[in-house]
Amino acid sequence: MGSNPTLAASLRHQGYPMSSTCTHIDAVGQLAPPREVCETCIAIGGEWVNLRQCLTCAVTLCCDSSPNQHMSGHNRATAHPLMRSAMPDQDWSWCFVDQAMLRETPGGWETFDPFLEAGTSMVGEYLAAGGSPDPAPDFVNEHGFPLGDWFAFVREARANGELEPRDAARLEAIPGWRW
């Protein structure tokens, strides 16, 4: 998955957890590839922004940025808990119930936090270039990523016991990192 800091920051600021356990993975069915249209928008003459595919029944519907928000409506109507992006070059999934980002790995499904991962991938370069491990809260790096906000977010998550041990270990392995 390519990191999407805008999506990640949006989810984080909406109060979604850093990562959590999803207990709905067994709801993933055998899926055909997603369609290139919102099946409901086509039927009613609507328009869509991005597409999502239900991981239970494989229907392809529009996202919450679209006027009709058919995928969220599908979740409310059917209680199908999981969906994935049906957009090219996006391979993330979402559990509506657990409010968790998911991805399929060779070892199975895992939850993850895209904001945490995007920052983790950038902080090593930043620190190696002489960046401060205590940047200003409003510091944004040359890629437009809010690293100051990210440092505060990670430290707060650790202080609150919300940082996964695997994520803490990744950070602690970065030269120059400190809590």
List where the protein language model places each region:
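Short, positively charged low-complexity motifs
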Residues: M1-N4
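Ala/Thr-enriched low-complexity intrinsically disordered regions
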Residues: T6-A9
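Cys/His-rich, Zn2+-coordinating zinc-finger modules
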Residues: S20-D26, A32-P34, I44, T60-E110
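Short cysteine-rich clusters marking metal-coordination/redox-active sites
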Residues: C38-C41, C54
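Canonical RING-type zinc finger of E3 ubiquitin-protein ligases
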Residues: G46-T56
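Hydrophobic alpha-helical segments that drive targeting, anchoring, or assembly
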Residues: R52-Q53, L61, A157
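IQ-motif-like calmodulin-binding regions
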Residues: E110-W179
